[in-house]
UniProtKB/Swiss-Prot annotation:
Residues 337-381 are annotated as: Disordered. The keyword GTP-binding does not apply. One of its GO terms (molecular function) is oxidoreductase activity. Its main location: membrane. It is an enzyme of class 1 (oxidoreductase). This is 11-beta-hydroxysteroid dehydrogenase-like 5. The chain crosses the membrane at residues 11-31. Its EC number is 1.1.1.-. One of its GO terms (cellular component) is membrane. Substrate binds at S186. The active site is at Y199 (proton acceptor). The lineage of its organism: Eukaryota, Viridiplantae, Streptophyta, Embryophyta, Tracheophyta. InterPro entries: NAD(P)-bd_dom_sf, Sc_DH/Rdtase_CS, SDR_fam. Pfam families: adh_short (PF00106).
Amino acid sequence: MVDLLNSVMNLVAPPATMVVMAFAWPLLSFISFSERAYNSYFATENMEDKVVVITGASSAIGEQIAYEYAKRGANLVLVARREQRLRVVSNKAKQIGANHVIIIAADVIKEDDCRRFITQAVNYYGRVDHLVNTASLGHTFYFEEVSDTTVFPHLLDINFWGNVYPTYVALPYLHQTNGRIVVNASVENWLPLPRMSLYSAAKAALVNFYETLRFELNGDVGITIATHGWIGSEMSGGKFMLEEGAEMQWKEEREVPANGGPLEEFAKMIVAGACRGDAYVKFPNWYDVFLLYRVFTPNVLRWTFKLLLSTEGTRRSSLVGVGSGMPVDESSSQMKLMLEGGPPRVPASPPRYTASPPHYTASPPRYPASPPRYPASPPRFSQFNIQEL
């Protein structure tokens, strides 16, 4: 009986849904537009003297969001690992309208760090109104061509747990203020772009986590999920941040050129949408059409990417920069490491994939039982000195 019911629904539900949506879409769009217009003019949250905690605030979208909240007169708590960059952002935020700004050097993938900076924010200001999670880490490599798998945990830790931990710690205080969580997601959570497999997986987990949490909170704490395509940020160049703050840049020698969009405009849209109480902020909106293709005609996406990526030759990935404590060139919008002591360290060995030995062997184990990934020694930022600038 169940099999018969499923067979009938498989035949009836898809076309029936498309017919209903065709008739309901204009009405739903009008309702959404009317609600947005009303909230814009009559129900926008006043951020004057409100407290906003922003992770990943040292650069890119986090930095621009800090400036937008500063223009609205908010009190800011800027969190990132690069303390020097936080000082620069703090000074500018003060100049353009922020009442008070404190900076805290911390690592969002460590629960103790998250508990520390949220607690210090509450001790200093007495409340938390908005938590903005922007810390993110992207990549532009083909999964099977990666030689160093130690980057895998970093991608998932920062893109997923780097949002979950601050949210978990901040929720009790957000309940007290009926506050809001702002999430930096991406269209890659449902658009399967090549060379972004782990990033897409992490963003998909992130969006599903917050959509579920939205129902659990039942409106007591708002959630705004910001999804974007390619924007002009460090991440659009494949930037990585290693655990100790060193950065590296992957360069795919056979990648499709992609130009970033206006980062400042997206930040302005995010803050405006959060203050209106929007569930989603999308930039650009036309990316939504790809979701329809994925649901109803997934082969179209596959053919499109196959056409875009088809070329002659062998795929090759090279590591442009990696290290610890090396100077960073910030003269351009996409930060690149300036390697000390010679040219970039590009392996001169033969291609990684050969006919032998087999890619997977029974021994030794791929992941050794020791040492643990996160050493027991004190983290890089063991002191969290609140500094008002």
